[in-house]
Amino acid sequence: MTYLSQLEALLFVAGEEGLSLRQLVSLLELTPTALQQQLDKLSQKYKEDKESGLCLIESSRTYKLVTKECLAPLLKDYAKAPINQTLSRASLEVLSIVAYKQPITRIEIDEIRGVNSSGALSKLVAFGLVQEAGKKEVIGRPNLYATTDYFLDYMGINHLEELVDISSIAVEEQETTLF
């Protein structure tokens, strides 16, 4: 496996949070100079590939994979899609976690699920079921997420206390490996 493919995989899994140069150096065990060469190579790969919808950006000293700007109108239309579309299993999982654990950060959601949740979380925000609810007072000040009044309406309840008590739900332990 090449450093380029490892770099791409790490940035994909990091999602909207991205990864700093220091984190990438540590994870890939490369020198900063060698890593910068790989970042430049990946950036060039995306620029030249007209079939790819992604590009590599550096924002606030953090590297992220994002969609190309020319796709913004399509993605805005997607984000405005009516809620009557069925929510994916991932979106339902994230919505459940936010409902029961709010306020909660995306990283905390990821830790519970064991996979990156940024896509599902973005979809829930776009649908108006979840909203940013401040910043957590820790290093990096990540966004906190909570459900909205629309979530309550959508679920047909008036208060979060009306949600089913999760301790009464039998959970089937299942171990899975993502990688």
From Swiss-Prot:
GO CC entries = cytoplasm
Q: Does the keyword Plastid apply?
A: no
Q: Which UniProt keywords apply?
A: Cell cycle, Cell division, Chromosome partition, Cytoplasm
Q: Which InterPro entries match?
A: ScpB_csome_segregation, WH-like_DNA-bd_sf, WH_DNA-bd_sf
**Statement: the UniProt record of this protein carries the keyword Cytoplasm:** yes
Q: Enumerate the subcellular locations listed in this protein's record, separating them with semicolons.
A: Cytoplasm
Record-level GO BP terms: cell division; chromosome separation; DNA replication
Superkingdom field: Bacteria
- A Pfam match is SMC_ScpB
The chain's coiled-coil residues are none
Instruction: Cite the record's note on assembly.
Output: Homodimer. Homodimerization may be required to stabilize the binding of ScpA to the Smc head domains. Component of a cohesin-like complex composed of ScpA, ScpB and the Smc homodimer, in which ScpA and ScpB bind to the head domain of Smc. The presence of the three proteins is required for the association of the complex with DNA.
- What family does this chain come from, according to its entry? Belongs to the ScpB family.
Q: What does this protein do?
A: Participates in chromosomal partition during cell division. May act via the formation of a condensin-like complex containing Smc and ScpA that pull DNA away from mid-cell into both cell halves.
State what protein this is by name: Segregation and condensation protein B
State the organism named in the record: Streptococcus equi subsp. zooepidemicus (strain H70)
